[in-house]
Amino acid sequence: WMASDLSRLDLVAIQIDGIHIKEELLLVAAVGIDVEGTKHPLGVIEGATESAATAQALLDNLIGRGLDPSVCRLFIVDGAKALSKAIRRTFGSHTPIQRCQIHKARNITERLPKAMQASVRRTLRQAWELDDAEKAQKLIRNLARRLELDAPGVRDSILEGLDEILTVNRLGLPAELRRSLACTNVIENMNGTVRRVCRNVKHWRDAAM
């Protein structure tokens, strides 16, 4: 499977996400989406952390199997900066990257007092649903300003990576398609399968062995 030919797949988007199997073990997986909306598991690679080197190894594997790096595709990632860095280094600085909105909302609300979580989640969802990326960005910046006094540590988290959070809004995609491509949910099904299989593995060996 990890050596299968990818050259005939007409992929328009690729989702990449890390799967934490054990504290010291992470698998980085990729799923492609073609023009018909069909999902294609592309590859999984083992790494100690979700580092640039691990992400680069996965991308190099995909290219070596026929993925054309000159074709512009949307990449959806879980938010790890190392992934975005490796993608842009490999596919070009203008490659569109969408950071998972669900991961982002979870990271923000988990740092808030419970009484504030629902209202912040609603505001973020309202921003995600906007067709106009500039209006969405303004709404999120206003939220960050409102939280500056009540939860000062959360402000930077809200604003961090804001451009990549709104990529699908900026691309002007239809609402239904935008919701599908704004998060890494497609890959979560594959991640769940990998986790179930890995629970039965008693002794892990290096992938090169």
What are these regions (language model features)?
Residues 72-81, 86-123:
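Conserved beta-strand -> loop -> alpha-helix junction used to position metal-binding or nucleic-acid-contacting
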Residues 33, 61-65, 86-93, 111, ...:
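Conserved, well-folded catalytic cores of nucleic-acid-processing
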Residues 9, 24, 52-56, 69, ...:
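Amphipathic alpha-helical transducer elements in NTP-driven molecular machines
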Residues 4, 8-12, 53, 59-60, ...:
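Conserved phosphate-chemistry cores used by DNA topoisomerases
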Residues 1-76, 81, 85-86, 90-93:
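RNase H-like nuclease fold core
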Residues 130-209:
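Acidic/histidine-rich catalytic cores and adjacent linkers
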Residues 21, 98, 203-207:
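Alpha-helix N-cap/helix-initiation sites
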Residues 106-141, 147:
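Surface-exposed, charged/polar loop-rich segments
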